[in-house]
Amino acid sequence: MNRLFILFVIGALFLASCKRDGSSEQSSDLDIPDEVVNEGVQELEISEEVMQDIVQNISSPVEMAALIKSLDVPFSAKYLASVDNVDNYTTSFQQAFNLGIFGADLGFLNMYNKTNSVINYISAIKTLADGIKVGQFFDFVTLKRLAQTNENLDSLMYISVHSFNQVDKYLNTNQRGNLSALMITGVWMEGLYLATQVYKEAPHDAIKERIGEQKIIMGDLMLILENYNKDKQFAHLVEQLNELKALFAQVEIKIIPGEPEAVEQDGMLVIVQNEESVVTISDELIGTIIEKTEEIRNNLIGS
């Protein structure tokens, strides 16, 4: 399931950054009259090499939750965004971003088998998805049934990830890559927030290293967001995240090459270059990153 979630994030980053052909005409029932539609904004292309770097380094919220759980850190609902705020998200900018936030929280809840809370987050996701007119891609009846019966949590995760994949594909093919970028930013932001909050209460080197590694993916994510910087809301988002990026710039990451390894992927033998990353981040710096992450995340979700 972790690999599926990673592919969802990677695909969204890739599609949001590539030039797209085709008519800009959309059916009226699918138009979203909001202030984040990017008209006349030149889009950037991300090279395949850069995308491979993202694949190698991104940490999905599911991976982060799995790491946290493996360290015997007890579950705490206080880390999660409150579903009580969902009705306050009235613009598609807010709805797309918080769709990512709640999607990350859903992965965290699933990892800890908190099925009672899962239902509330599925309902919140439905509200936000309907708000940007992508609710048709979520089978909410099946999702709630799986959550209520505690039946096959792998299936619950799979359907959730597949739904987000469909949403991303739809947004990008309908000239709404900006909303996809917001959704992915929400996913990443919440994953980082969860990690930093856990580390604050239960410091562990593995979590500290994973936090430091976010320096890499943040650089790529900022390229995508800056693509929509002509919109004032995106400009404000980028301005806030640049403060965090400046802190991550002080994190040192050294890549140590390892021995190549032959592995089977999709029935084919491929050579994988193993690498080890050594992250150097001071206690003072990670403390500042924790504070800044909390400040930005809470400001963005309105808590």
Task: Describe the residue ranges of each PLM region.
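C-terminal motif of bacterial Sec signal peptides marking the signal peptidase cleavage site
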Residues: 14-17
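Sec-dependent signal peptide recognition
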Residues: 2-8
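A cross-kingdom marker for long, charged
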Residues: 231-303
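Non-transmembrane, amphipathic alpha-helical segments
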Residues: 87, 91-94, 106-113, 117, ...
